[in-house]
Structures are given as structure tokens and as C-alpha cells.
Amino acid sequence: QTYLKEVKKTSISIDKTQNKVIEGNQNNLIQNLKYEVRLDQENQYIITSDLSEITYENDIEIVKMQKVTAIFIDGKNIPLTITSDKAIYNNSNYNTNFSDNIQIEYLNNVILSDKMDLDFNNNVINIFGNVQYDGIQGSVKTDNIKINLITKKIDIYMDKDKNNVEIITKK
């Protein structure tokens, strides 16, 4: 008698690469950590750091990163590159809070700020704290820039209504 058994293969893809684990702490310290996340068919998010500490809050992996580079690639394959001194990355929803010396580059545009939140739950980027934008058309100083990742709509506004956004055009 011959019995046939159907075997199903399950493929598991690991998103994070790590080069060196530093011992001696209850939390895991990792050098050169990299996460690659395919958000959907068209959008990809890659984040790397020189040094990271992995902790767990309510069974969710939270990664405190130092010397961070993140790249968000949309359907048009145009990268939005973010660098910062620090970031906190949530591995369950990929939301990332960047802080200290943030530089955002997209096409020929550069934004500098103190803080930035990349919120995939609401598909929005919030840039705040000493925001300075420099592009081909000119430069802007403001308190906040909000970018909708779906519609690409950009809101530029101040914390207080009595303050004005400063715009300098290039001629």
C-alpha cells in the first residue's frame, strides 16, 4: 500500500538583521540593527541604527535607536530619507518617533527639525520643533509640518494663531 501525504511549506521572513549583541544588560543592546518592512504592494519602510536597545512594553517590541537612518519608499519608487540622532521604533505597528538633529530629504527638498513622528496607523508624518524647510522655490520656518502619506497633502502651521509662518522665496 502507498500512502500520500500533502506537505505544506511555510515561509517565514525575518525583517531584522543584527551584527553584534552586547551583553551585560537586562535589555538587548544591538549594533547595526536593520528592519525592512513591506507595508503593502507599493510602499516599503527600512530603518537602521548604529546602536539599539530592544525592550518590551505590554508584549510589544519597542526599539530605542541611536544614529538612525530610515527610508520610506512609495509607489513611485521615490525615497524619503530621514536621519536623526535618536528614534523609538514600535515593531508591532512600525510607528517611529524621531528626535534630535532630524534631517528629511525628498527629491530636492530638505526639512530640518527637532522631532518627527511617522504614524502608519493614520498614514501621516508630523514634523515639529524648530522646523526649517529648504527647497527649489524657497525656504520656510514654521512650528509644524503635517504630511498625509496617502494624499500627499501638506499642512504647514504654527502652534499659536498669532504667530506667522515665515516664507522666503528664491528668485
Regions found by a protein language model. Name each.
Residues 1-171:
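Mature-chain termini and adjacent capping regions
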